[in-house]
């Protein structure tokens, strides 16, 4: 197959919808990261189902460490699926976990479930109490 370039998040979602239909996946999850400079990044994510798609973000974060952020995203997805969250709630929880991990030094997520749930992905000024 020929390689297709995508330049926007919306184009990526459209391509993943085609992929989902072709290979009959129940759900596909994806993330996007835009580097804004000075250790500031904009994050968002999406889930594509067989009938629709859901997005979360963008959220801006000050990055302390990127190691383990993808693992944290997947952990958030699995937590949402295992607890029978809706696709939108799952992707919101996963984005919160993904974004929070960017603020934690080290290769694993130490934020609690409560920290993840309290993270407001719609608010640009987030205070994390530890």
What do these predicted ranges mean?
Residues 1-50:
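Conserved phosphate/ATP/ADP-binding segment of small-molecule kinases
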Residues 16-19, 116, 126:
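Generic hydrophobic, helix-prone segments enriched in Leu/Val/Ile
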Residues 57-121:
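Conserved post-catalytic alpha-helical subdomain immediately downstream of the catalytic base
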Residues 118-130:
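Glycine/Thr-rich phosphate-binding loops that ligate phosphate moieties of nucleotide
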Residues 27-29, 47, 67-71, 130:
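Short charge-dense sequence patches
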């Amino acid at each position: 197959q020929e390689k297709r370039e995508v330049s926007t998040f919306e184009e990526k979602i459209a391509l993943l919808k085609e992929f989902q239909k072709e290979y009959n996946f129940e759900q596909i999850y994806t993330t996007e990261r835009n580097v804004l400079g000075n250790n500031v990044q904009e994050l968002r994510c999406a889930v594509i189902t067989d009938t629709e798609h859901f997005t979360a973000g963008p959220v801006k974060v000050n990055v302390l460490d990127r190691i383990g952020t993808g693992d944290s995203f997947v952990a958030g997805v699995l937590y949402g699926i295992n607890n029978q969250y809706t696709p939108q709630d799952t992707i919101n929880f996963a984005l919160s976990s993904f974004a929070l991990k960017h603020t934690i030094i080290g290769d694993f997520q130490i934020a609690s479930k409560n920290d993840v749930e309290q993270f407001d992905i719609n608010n640009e000024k987030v205070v994390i109490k530890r």
